[in-house]
Amino acid sequence: MAFTFKQFHIDDLNCGMAVSTDAVVLGAWAPLTNAKQILDIGAGSGILGLMAAQRSQANITCIELDNTAAIACQHNIAQSPWASRIRLVQGSIQQLSQAEEYQGYFDHIICNPPYFEHGPQAQLSQRAMARHTDQLSFNELLAAIEQCLSPNGLASLILPIQSLHNFNHLLSQSRLEWVERVDIKSVEGKRANRVLCLLTTQTHRTVEPKVSELTLRDTSGQYSQAMVHLTQDFYLKL
């Protein structure tokens, strides 16, 4: 399925997951100010890397394991206005994070990670890879972020709220710490079902993490003012 934003176009037909609201919210929210080198882990169609390119002057590295998704990602990058600043690496983040040239290299890391920790795999193999943590566990993801993030760098993620307890347990065993948490409610009056996470490699932080909420739609189904403000540079009809 093709998806057109204000400044770029995505063809995600061959990718594991279609363009999602999760990805758009994460890509619009991640604080990229002053970032010079950005890493998009599990790039899929390339949407996060392209959003980062629109919002910054950084050089962006997209890493994608699946061959079919990587082909689509490269196509989308090539058709964008920022092809000269975005580089695709096909392979695993586990391998890339062990490469000496990438250790401590990135100012910002962005990732919409696999979120099904247990349960049956999706029937379509690419979709299964994109949705299940079998290919990239939270533990492996945090280890890769630790390896690749520069001193005082930042990492932005989006997770299902039900995964937060396990994620926090693993986070406590890493060198990463919370900077900010945003609980996302899909509709006003509903419970939060996603969480935006901002992490850093800074140690012994004395400032408490910032905690807030974001509601995507009001009770009539229309985008909230906060959602419009966040995504209006991307969605065509906003």
Swiss-Prot record:
Signal peptide: none
Catalytic activity: adenosine(37) in tRNA1(Val) + S-adenosyl-L-methionine = N(6)-methyladenosine(37) in tRNA1(Val) + S-adenosyl-L-homocysteine + H(+)
Cellular localization per UniProt: Cytoplasm
Enzyme Commission number(s): 2.1.1.223
GO MF term list: nucleic acid binding; tRNA (adenine-N6)-methyltransferase activity
A cellular component term, taken from the record's GO annotations: cytoplasm
Keyword terms, alphabetized: Cytoplasm, Methyltransferase, S-adenosyl-L-methionine, Transferase, tRNA processing
Keyword Protein transport: no
InterPro entries: DNA_methylase_N6_adenine_CS, SAM-dependent_MTases_sf, Small_mtfrase_dom, tRNA_Adenine-N(6)_MTase, tRNA_adenine-N6_MeTrfase
A GO BP entry: methylation
One Pfam assignment: MTS
Superkingdom: Bacteria
Enzyme category, top tier: transferase
Family statement: Belongs to the methyltransferase superfamily. tRNA (adenine-N(6)-)-methyltransferase family.
Function field: Specifically methylates the adenine in position 37 of tRNA(1)(Val) (anticodon cmo5UAC).
Protein name from the UniProt record: tRNA1(Val) (adenine(37)-N6)-methyltransferase
